[in-house]
C-alpha cells in the first residue's frame, strides 16, 4: 500500500512539474529565435552578388579548362597539337575524369547559380534587364554543356532546392537548342536601356546594349551549328539574329575580367594551365587556316627553337611509329620547341576569358 501511494505521488509530482514548465516556457522562449541568428550573416544575398559569382563559375577554374577545353576540345578541333599522351583529344584515347570535367564543375556551380538567380528574380517580380541578362548567361552555360555531351539535364536542372527535383530528366539536344533560341529572343526583348548589375557584371559592366548584341550573336552561333541538322530553322534564326543586331566590333567582345589572385576562379583558368603545362603547340591544321591572316601573329609566337611560326601536325608523338594505314614510318617529334606556342600576352592568369567574339 505504501508503494502504491509513493507511485501516485510521483505521478502527481511529474504532472505538476510539466504544468509549471509549460507556464514558464513562453517566457523562456521569448526572443530565442533572435538569439539564434547570426547578426553578421545576410538573410538574403543580392542578385548582383550571385551573378558575379556565377559568371566566374562559368568562366571556370584550372580543373575544367585544362581537361575539357584544352586536353580534349582544343586538340580535337585542331587548334592545338601536342606529343603528350594524356592530351587525348586527337589520339582517340578516353579518360572519363577528363571528359566529364565540364559537367562535374558546371552543374553544382554555374547551373545551380543561374537557376537560383532566375528564381529569385521571379520572386522579386523582376522581368526587366536583369532577368534578360540572366537568361542570356543561362543559355551560354547550357550551350557549352549540350555541345559537349549532347542530351543533358536542362529543363529540370539546378532545381534540387527550388523545386525538390533531385533526379532531373535528360532533354534531347534538339529540344534544348530550340528552347535556347526562344530564350535568347525573349531575353533580348526584356533588356532595357539600363541595368542594376553594374560592376557585379564582369563581362559588360552592366552595359545593356552589349548584352543585347551578345544575345543576338549567340543566337546566330546556335543557328550556324544547326545547319547540318535543320537547315530551314537555322536560316530563319540566323536572319532573325542578324536583323536584331549582332556584335559589330571588338568593343562588343564578351569576355570575363580576371585577376592574378587570389586562388581559384578569380584567375583565368587557361592562364593557370599555361603556368604549369607547356606541352601544347599551334596545330598545323589551324596554321593552314590562318595562312596570310594577321591574327596568326597575335595568337601565337614562334617556338624557342625557331624564328617563324610553324604548326605541329596533330597526332604527333615523341617516338617514331609505323602507320597502320600506309605502312610508312611516321617520324617522332624530337624538338617540340620548333613549333609555335600561344602568344605570351594571352597566357597570363589575369587575361580576360573570352566567351564570344
Task: Describe the predicted segments one by one.
Residues 9, 33-42, 297, 354:
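A generic signature of intrinsically disordered, low-complexity regions enriched in glycine/proline
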Residues 44-45, 80-137, 141-357:
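Structured, solvent-exposed acidic/aromatic patches
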Residues 11, 25, 76-77, 256:
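Intrinsically disordered, low-complexity regions enriched for glutamine and histidine
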Residues 14-15, 71, 142, 225:
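General helical structural elements
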Residues 26-81, 85, 94, 105-108, ...:
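Membrane-proximal, proline-rich intrinsically disordered regions
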Amino acid at each position: 500500500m505504501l508503494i502504491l501511494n509513493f507511485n501516485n505521488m510521483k505521478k502527481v509530482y511529474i504532472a505538476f512539474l510539466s504544468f509549471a514548465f509549460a507556464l514558464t516556457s513562453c517566457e523562456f522562449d521569448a526572443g530565442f529565435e533572435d538569439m539564434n541568428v547570426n547578426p553578421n550573416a545576410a538573410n538574403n544575398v543580392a542578385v548582383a552578388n550571385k551573378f558575379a559569382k556565377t559568371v566566374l563559375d562559368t568562366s571556370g577554374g584550372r580543373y575544367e579548362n585544362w581537361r575539357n577545353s584544352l586536353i580534349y576540345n582544343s586538340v580535337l578541333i585542331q587548334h592545338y597539337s601536342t606529343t603528350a599522351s594524356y592530351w587525348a583529344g586527337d589520339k582517340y584515347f578516353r579518360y572519363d575524369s577528363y571528359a566529364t570535367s565540364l559537367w562535374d564543375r558546371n552543374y553544382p556551380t554555374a547551373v545551380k547559380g543561374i537557376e537560383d538567380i532566375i528564381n529569385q528574380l521571379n520572386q522579386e517580380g523582376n522581368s526587366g534587364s536583369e532577368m534578360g541578362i540572366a537568361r542570356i548567361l543561362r543559355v551560354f552555360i547550357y550551350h557549352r554543356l549540350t555541345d559537349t555531351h549532347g542530351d543533358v539535364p536542362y529543363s529540370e536542372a539546378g532545381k534540387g532546392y527550388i523545386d525538390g527535383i533531385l533526379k532531373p530528366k535528360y532533354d534531347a539536344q534538339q529540344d534544348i537548342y530550340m528552347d535556347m533560341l526562344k530564350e535568347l529572343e525573349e531575353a533580348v526583348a526584356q533588356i532595357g536601356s539600363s541595368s542594376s548589375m553594374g560592376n557585379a557584371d564582369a563581362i559588360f559592366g552592366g552595359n545593356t546594349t552589349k548584352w543585347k548584341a551578345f544575345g543576338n550573336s549567340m543566337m546566330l552561333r546556335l543557328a550556324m551549328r544547326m545547319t547540318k541538322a535543320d537547315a530551314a530553322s537555322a536560316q530563319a534564326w540566323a536572319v532573325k539574329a542578324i536583323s536584331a543586331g549582332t556584335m559589330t566590333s571588338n568593343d562588343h567582345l564578351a569576355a570575363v575580367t580576371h585577376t592574378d589572385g587570389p586562388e581559384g576562379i578569380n584567375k583565368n583558368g587557361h592562364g593557370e594551365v599555361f603556368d604549369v603545362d607547356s606541352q601544347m603547340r599551334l596545330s598545323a591544321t589551324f596554321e593552314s587556316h590562318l595562312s596570310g591572316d594577321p591574327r596568326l601573329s597575335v595568337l601565337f609566337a614562334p617556338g624557342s627553337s625557331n624564328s617563324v611560326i610553324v604548326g605541329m601536325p596533330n597526332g604527333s608523338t615523341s617516338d617514331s611509329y609505323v602507320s597502320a594505314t600506309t605502312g610508312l614510318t611516321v617520324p617522332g617529334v624530337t624538338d617540340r620547341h620548333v613549333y609555335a606556342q600561344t602568344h605570351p600576352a594571352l597566357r597570363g592568369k589575369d587575361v580576360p576569358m573570352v566567351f564570344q567574339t
